[in-house]
């Protein structure tokens, strides 16, 4: 179960970083 949460967080973080990169 914890691994699933970690995977979700990683996905969210990646999405957030991608958005930040696109803005720059």
Swiss-Prot record:
Naming one, the record's GO cellular component terms include: extracellular region
Principal cellular location given in the protein's record: secreted
The entry's localization annotation reads: Secreted
GO MF terms held by the record: toxin activity
Establish whether keyword Secreted is in the entry: yes
Q: Which family does it belong to?
A: Belongs to the cationic peptide 04 (cupiennin) family. 05 subfamily.
Domain of life of the native organism:
Eukaryota
Q: In which tissues is it expressed?
A: Expressed by the venom gland.
What is the protein name stated in its UniProt record? Cupiennin-5a
Keywords, alphabetical: Secreted, Toxin
């Amino acid at each position: 179960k914890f691994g699933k949460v970690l995977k979700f967080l990683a996905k969210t973080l990646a999405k957030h970083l991608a958005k930040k990169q696109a803005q720059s």
